[in-house]
Amino acid sequence: RDTDRSRGLGDVYKRQLMDLPIVLSHKTAWLYHNVARPSEPLSRASSLYDEDSLANEAEPTASLPKLGLDAKGLRASTAVGIVADYLVSLGIPREELDHIDTLVNFDFERSTPAGFRCHVFGAPVPPGHLIEVAEGLLVVDEAMCFVQAGSWMSEPEQLEYGYEICARYHLNHLSTGDYIEMGQRYTVADLIAYCNENRSRQGAIRAAAVLKRVHDGARSPMETATAIMVVAKRSQGGLGYAKVELNHRVDVPNEFKYLAKAGYFEIDVYAPASGTGVEYNGSDHLDKQRSASDAERMTVLSALGFRMIVLTGTQFAHQLQLHRAMNAIALAIGLKCCLLYTSDAADEARSV
């Protein structure tokens, strides 16, 4: 009995120590990806805690931050503070870190030190979906994070996140700054492949369903918003029409090149079945030269048989104007049963 008691106390003490590496996941990973966008996944030979695999790896890259997580006998409570301080230094507000989400392979590896919320993957975590951000600290990539997002995001929020992951821009939701243009990091096919490879993992089925409405290559947050208004389910305020393309290229035929300077145009959101194009024109389109180019664009696209509808920032800012614009899009696409907002009076009554 004394031996059993000693072993039990030893297990308690061991749980107070921190196993490495620490893997950030779920909402903490989402917060991390908002403020820092590493692109190279860490490739490991085996599962997270295969000590032989770790021992055979090359030394960590010199550029990786040394946080002190590898200190001998590091207590879990100390590790919580180290990780939180590091995330705050990157720009994550401390109030967002009342707990830090972490991931382990199996349930027997789970520990519950104060400050950490431990999640179980239920199998060896795919090493190609882990990114090393500091010595002893990893984060799941955005493909895995997208699937996990269903545990705290609503379905419309997860839909938006899918567009952002597959976009050609980055918007930091923790900052008031503008978005930045950047190369596309993932494709919808990448995310679908991850879901298919991990269908038994929690959240994969819902994520796969959301991805049916996600499209590649949005160039701005407002282009994403325009697409979502069309593809989102009717119960979520959209038109429920997912068969669209983003940035559909239209080459100007030789016989129409005398009408415009540009050799081709791209339509923000295009519904090929009806030939309907939806454009978002932001404040930059108010420039005189830009307005002239827009006029040429609409002339050529109309001559080619496209049905074009333009949305503006003012319409997005005023609910009734946006409702009328969505009615026009529904009519052009041919969604006869989708005229959701029939009059200002009805909408005012609905809002009350």
Give the role of each language-model region.
Residues R1, D11-Q202:
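Short gly/ser-rich loop at a beta-strand->alpha-helix junction or flexible surface loop bordering the NTP-binding
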Residues R1-Q16, Y341-V352:
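Single conserved hydrophobic/aromatic residue that forms the stacking wall/gate
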Residues D4, D141, A262-Y264:
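A generic fold-level signal
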Residues G115-C118, D287, L320, V352:
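Short, function-defining helix-loop hinge/capping sites that tune catalysis or transport
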Residues E181, R185-S343:
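Surface segments flanking catalytic/ligand-binding clefts of nucleic-acid enzymes
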